[in-house]
Amino acid sequence: MEGQSRSGSAKSGTRTGLGPLPGTHGALQTGTPSKKVNSSFQLPAKNTGPTPSEPRLALAPVGPRAAVSPPSERPRLALSSPRPILAPLSTAGEQKRPPPHRSSKPAPTSVGQLVVSAAAGPKPPPVASVSILAPKSLGQLVISASAMPRPTPAPLGPILSPTSRDQKQLSPTSVGPKPALATSGLSLALASQEQPPQSPSSPSPVPSPVLSPSQESHLAPATVTSTPASERQLPARQKDTAVRRPIPPADGCLHTPVQAAGLATSPPRAQTSSDPRLSPSFRARPEAPRHSPEDPVLPPPPQTLPLDVSSGLPESGTRSPGLLSPTFRPGIPSNQTVPPPLPKPPRSPSRSPSRSPNRSPCVPPAPEVALPRPVTQGAGPGKCPSPNLQTQESPVATATSPTSSWSAQPTCKSDPGFRITVVTWNVGTAMPPDDVTSLLHLGGGHDSDGADMIAIGLQEVNSMINKRLKDALFTDQWSELFMDALGPFNFVLVSTVRMQGVILLLFAKYYHLPFLRDVQTDCTRTGLGGYWGNKGGVSVRLAAFGHMLCFLNCHLPAHMDKAEQRKDNFQTILSLQQFQGPGAHGILDHDLVFWFGDLNFRIESYDLHFVKFAIDSNQLHQLWEKDQLNMAKNTWPILKGFQEGPLNFAPTFKFDVGTNKYDTSAKKRKPAWTDRILWKVKAPSGGPSPSGRESHRLQVTQHSYRSHMEYTVSDHKPVAARFLLQFAFRDDVPLVRLEVADEWARPEQAVVRYRVETVFARSSWDWIGLYRVGFRHCKDYVAYVWAKHEEVDGNIYQVTFSEESLPKGHGDFILGYYSHHHSILIGVTEPFQISLPTSESASSSTDSSGTSSEGEDDSTLELLAPKSRSPSPGKSKRHRSRSPGLARFPSLALRPSSRERRGGSRSPSPQSRQLPRVAPDRGHSSGSRGSSEEGPSGPPGPWAFPPAVPRSLGLLPALRLETVDPGGGGSWGPDQEAPDPNSLSPSPQGRLGLEDGGLGP
């Protein structure tokens, strides 16, 4: 073989990454001749020391340079070069010269694959004979491990490794002696002379190399180009369990395994995972640490509604921050993932909800089942779960860079989400029905079946003069209805706004209140050129867990030909409604906008008979394309980004009142989908996230979108939609944490300690309210105390409720910290018990237990204006009562209720709370009190009112109101201790209560 040529024909060439192609003269072609050896094609020298492993064959260079140590052979092989794998190397003793012509020896004509087979039995003594085997198949060299002399070490050259997996390994008896390619500087030799004999039935496979991530990056181009060769031939299956070459499925092709020199006798430089799904370049993410040394591979967790489709697999090492439950305590270990259920508040020690579980150490969910939603959060899928929430098989793991998931905050991929129900209903000036449970999807009473937040938009509420007068003084009957229905389900009225007949109510579970901030309302009139509020829009915006949400309830112009006017009105509403604060100024600046109401879009082109036929035959899809709103989505730029669920329910307008029949009057209005619910998620505009991808702050999934045909009080049918929100992060740290004892059995135990965060801006008008479980709004308190700022220990403060203000008897209560700046409860406790003994005077008006336990009639007298019952100076001047339940009054004559006579717990300002128990000497209020403050000696008689009260609606003489002083200290007339038919006070305690406090907020 000395005369063998080293130069191949220029016509044959090579294939990139497949090794040299066979030439016509039996020599291996190497492509373009090179006079200089490329060091990148060198691998570390083979260690020929003894090893207990199986005998393996390796392709080693011949020459004196074979003894060079591995560190001197840097850099290692990189297949990114277009040069062939087998490059001729010069020996140390000769000069580099152009390769001469090769001799005409028989050569393989295949892709250049060399199969190295192990010998059977012990190795015979080395002999000097060397034979060349003619190709048995198409250009294939079959090399046997027969006796042969070990050649002199040569400079290190590349080792040929099979690039496919389908080739069958030949039996050792069917192969001939092994050739030695001396001229080309290559030699085939045993990997180890001292290896023990091996049975012919267990040939030693050639393991694949273990490459570093930097070398694997160089292998990528060769991998792609080597696919055709790998599809034709495959070597025997590798059986080395210690080191296996994984094949990531995402690559779409097979990597070319390159056998490193000395691999059989030296340990690998990098150890890959035993899981074949993971590539050597796989690195665990920083936020998903390994929990067990026996489980180095990340378990595939269930993938429930992935937040970002462009990201990789959900991290199993991070625990999703679920919604904060009132039963969560700071002392509970982090491995408790499901708080106890709370259909009714448990009788347990009260603690303020601390920071979310996502702040605690990560707990990976079970890989075989989806992470269950805590039953106390009220956001379970209920009876109609989304298909996206079912347990899924996670895809096969692929090579993922450490920066594939940004970790500014953990992504809530397995978070059960925040559930919102939106309801719109044009009530047509009708009286409210008796029950709205099915409309609100309350789910049969279980807390987990309901929503976390409910937005209710009403249109055409009765706004006649007399009705508006009553609603100005007291809460309208529709608001009363929804508060009564939602109160037992732990819902609290967060905010409400009304513009004539358009009303928007926003409710939330009470334990979400500390994370709802920056609540603002606005309204825009569009009727009569903007001077009348029969048409227009009202909105409530707030920040929920750090995400800006906006709810917009609109009533747009009616009739078929007013589509352009509806567009103009919607643009006017969007442009005029502006909010304060850094979060979002305009409506479309919010992260999520819900737009709903009686939008009055009609069905064009089709006549009445065709529309009714499509409805009766359940062919609603024929009407979709002619719906004005659907057509406007494609043409109006103002509607860009708004989404709506499929209209799989019949048109909701117009019906005969009291029936489910469409309009049969003389007008015969054509049915239409006038009542709609749409939403829009703000497109990311802050640039890419730290991972290089666009960061999606939240994802919205609509679970249901339907009408409710069972309600027939109006000519419209109500429409409800349920949504699931998944947040990319949660701002779930309460600004104030309250702590109380397990039970208040004695008055001296009514001590409340609270801790204030440093970022919280306190006010001297902040107060702490005591609420019964099931309270309906933030002003529906039983008693309150001013939030003092005397420190007890560091940033811990303490307040005490007076014995007179505490309710008597037994019951479950909740404490809440009301912020004057935020106008909402920013801290709540768990339900706790109050068990105080009753006395003979428990029925007096100074005792709040009597008024609270007699029934909830007095609760309907609560003033529901946003600032009416807040004990702050600016709020006490507003006496526009929004108390629900006007029908519970015997007449329009206002009389002091027992709650108004209760005294200290209803004081609207600190000045009134500091009044002595004797009547203060105030000239402007003495006339209204009369002289009956002297006690029983005063002559009995009716109350003394001012002769004329122009600003107290003097047009209605039957409505008797008093003049209220600017300081909020105005009070009702004197009460008599002796029974008197004209006196409204049943006992002298009522007089003391009035002297102590004045009118309640």
UniProtKB/Swiss-Prot annotation:
Chain positions of motif RSXSXX motif 4: 880-885
Keyword Cytoplasm appears in the UniProt entry: yes
Keyword Glycosyltransferase: no
Chain span(s) of sequence motif RSXSXX motif 2: 351-356
Pfam families to which the protein is assigned, alphabetical: Exo_endo_phos2, SKICH
Positions of post-translational Phosphoserine modification: 171, 292, 325, 898, 985
Source organism of this protein record: Rattus norvegicus (Rat)
Renumbered ranges of motif RSXSXX motif 3: 869-874
Name of the featured protein: Phosphatidylinositol 4,5-bisphosphate 5-phosphatase A
Post-translational modification: Phosphorylated on Ser/Thr residues.
Residues with the Asymmetric dimethylarginine modification: 56, 76, 83
SMART domains per UniProt: IPPc
Class of the enzyme per the UniProt entry, highest EC level: hydrolase
Sequence motif RSXSXX motif 5, residues: 906-911
Biased composition (Basic and acidic residues): 284-294
Family statement: Belongs to the inositol 1,4,5-trisphosphate 5-phosphatase type II family.
Record field: compositional bias (Low complexity): 13-28, 180-196, 349-361, 394-411, 838-853, 905-917, 925-936
Residue ranges of the motif RSXSXX motif 1: 6-11
Residues recorded with modification Omega-N-methylarginine: 56, 65, 83
UniProt remark on domains: The 5 Arg-Ser-Xaa-Ser-Xaa-Xaa (RSXSXX) motifs may constitute binding sites for the 14-3-3 protein.
Cell location: Cytoplasm
Compositional bias annotation for Pro residues: 197-210, 338-348, 937-949
Region (Disordered): 1-130, 144-412, 837-1001
Gene Ontology CC entries for this record: cytoplasm; dendritic shaft; growth cone; neuron projection; plasma membrane; ruffle; ruffle membrane
Organs and tissues of expression: Expressed in heart, brain, kidney, stomach, small intestine and lung. Not expressed in spleen, thymus, skeletal muscle, testis and skin.
GO BP annotations listed: negative regulation of microtubule polymerization; negative regulation of neuron projection development; phosphatidylinositol dephosphorylation
Keyword annotations of the record: Cytoplasm, Hydrolase, Methylation, Phosphoprotein, Repeat, SH3-binding
